[in-house]
């Protein structure tokens, strides 16, 4: 016999293009949708950065000598390389046509997460403080609607031992980020000793399937009826400390 246990809904929403010059906030925009308690709102980081006017015009950037030299190796414009360096704590790996850095947030990713896609002009870094941004959006939504929701800001990142980019949570508020399941029992009564689930990353990846990573134009996703804890989780709790990273 097969029994239906869980049914989760994933709703992709098209919204107006965000420039940062709107006379409404993201919370006000999102609140126009009929939200329900325990909805999880996943927002593409591009939208958040643009709404926060975190876009740098190329003609305002003066590349350093380091950026100019690196640009020749990477095949990127010196201005783009300068922003990559400015957004990083350190360079983790450097090779022909690629640079992997640790960002100021602690993320290890290509190009410090710096992007030019889906931006009509300028260079777009990641949001300055994604957890803070997620929290402000969540609080704004709850004040307007009275609904208890979670917010995740997601981005696409590559994975070191697998091909293809995948959605990850860079900012989290109101929903679990890292789900510690140690002490729970499995189906056969054995106690879980080490299990920690990156549940916010799993939700971010789920949303990315609907968002797409090209010209789909769906930067906002509602995940409804997700069987996950709602608490004061953050994106930071998903970052492995450098001293715990056996590959660096």
UniProtKB/Swiss-Prot annotation:
One of its GO terms (biological process) is F420-0 metabolic process. It is an enzyme of class 6 (ligase). A divalent metal cation 2 binds at residues 156, 213. Binds 2 divalent metal cations per subunit. The ions could be magnesium and/or manganese. Monovalent cation. The ion could be potassium. GO terms for molecular function: coenzyme F420-0:L-glutamate ligase activity; coenzyme F420-1:gamma-L-glutamate ligase activity; GTP binding; metal ion binding. InterPro entries: F420-0_g-glutamyl_ligase, F420-0_gamma-glut_ligase-dom, F420_ligase_CofE_arc. The keyword Acyltransferase does not apply. It comes from the Archaea. A divalent metal cation 1 binds at residues 115, 155. Its cofactor is Mg(2+); Mn(2+); K(+). It catalyses: oxidized coenzyme F420-0 + GTP + L-glutamate = oxidized coenzyme F420-1 + GDP + phosphate + H(+); oxidized coenzyme F420-1 + GTP + L-glutamate = oxidized coenzyme F420-2 + GDP + phosphate + H(+). Its EC number is 6.3.2.31, 6.3.2.34. GTP binds at residues 15-18, 45-46, 50, 118, 211-218. HAMAP family: F420_ligase_CofE (MF_01258). Homodimer. Catalyzes the GTP-dependent successive addition of two or more gamma-linked L-glutamates to the L-lactyl phosphodiester of 7,8-didemethyl-8-hydroxy-5-deazariboflavin (F420-0) to form coenzyme F420-0-glutamyl-glutamate (F420-2) or polyglutamated F420 derivatives. This is Coenzyme F420:L-glutamate ligase. The gene is cofE.
